[in-house]
């Protein structure tokens, strides 16, 4: 049984320039006191073919977490284009928002992100080198992919880290 229930994730700037930071409003409920902080991370998948291009955009610790409904804003810098293969700068990729307790990930929310030129002319006749000043990102907020992991919370032995539950956005507003 999870002690922390993610209620909603709002991406406050789902459509923005490629170089703009990502801004999230995260709301969750804590049903029992926690001894330690929660860690939230945002990861940008730079290339579907190789994890070495994944970039941790930011991480933040939230705590102490009181029992009840909690909300905070999480801002993470845009990915570093120099760490992304040039052929993967445009097109569809993924961002992953994760939450962990005591180094145990208990939830992961994945969103598709489409990076494309803003103008139709550039989309039809792209320059040889990608001009990121002309690229906009659009996060598909309507269909997040939510994966929940059972973990060991504080002194409870109710969970094992090897089990996981997957689903789309049941009960999660994006």
Curated annotation (Swiss-Prot):
One of its GO terms (molecular function) is histone binding. It is found in: Nucleus. It comes from the Eukaryota. Residues 155-174 are annotated as: Disordered. GO terms for cellular component: chromatin; chromosome, telomeric region; cytosol; H3 histone acetyltransferase complex; nucleus. One of its GO terms (biological process) is nucleosome disassembly. Keywords: Chaperone, Chromatin regulator, Nucleus, Transcription, Transcription regulation. Pfam families: ASF1_hist_chap. Its main location: nucleus. Residues 157-168 have a biased composition (Polar residues). Histone chaperone that facilitates histone deposition and histone exchange and removal during nucleosome assembly and disassembly. Belongs to the ASF1 family. Interacts with histone H3 and histone H4. This is Histone chaperone ASF1.
């Amino acid at each position: 049984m999870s002690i922390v229930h993610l209620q909603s994730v709002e991406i406050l700037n789902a459509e923005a320039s490629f170089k703009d930071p990502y801004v999230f409003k995260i709301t969750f409920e804590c049903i029992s006191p926690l001894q330690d902080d929660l860690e939230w991370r945002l990861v940008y998948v730079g290339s579907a073919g190789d994890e070495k291009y994944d970039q941790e955009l930011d991480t933040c610790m939230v705590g102490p977490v009181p029992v009840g409904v909690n909300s905070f804003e999480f801002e993470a810098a845009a990915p570093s284009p120099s760490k992304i293969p040039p052929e993967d700068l445009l097109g569809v990729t993924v961002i992953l928002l994760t939450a962990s307790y005591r180094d145990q990930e208990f939830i992961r929310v994945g969103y598709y992100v489409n990076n494309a030129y803003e103008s139709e002319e550039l989309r039809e006749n792209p320059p040889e080198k990608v001009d990121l000043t002309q690229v906009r990102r659009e996060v598909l907020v309507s269909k997040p992919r939510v994966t929940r992991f059972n973990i060991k919370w504080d002194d409870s032995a109710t969970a094992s880290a090897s089990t996981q539950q997957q689903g789309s956005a049941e009960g999660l507003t994006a």
